[in-house]
Amino acid sequence: MFVRLTRKDDGGAVYVNAAQVRGVSEERDVTWVYVGKLAYMVEESAKAVVTLLEAEMNGGFLK
């Protein structure tokens, strides 16, 4: 599963999967996803998918 993210600095887009994500945070109305040393803004339409990414990062819904 890949999610389209927008770079914080120049607005360029990138596609990442859960294996590449090292963290997710919420600031005001914006969701940031951290990949390597870069922060990416999640497009509004992808927020539900980021929830799935977080679950995948944390070993799935069931442990």
Model-found features: residue ranges?
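Eukaryotic intrinsically disordered, low-complexity regulatory linkers and tails enriched in Ser/Thr/Pro
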Residues: 1-63
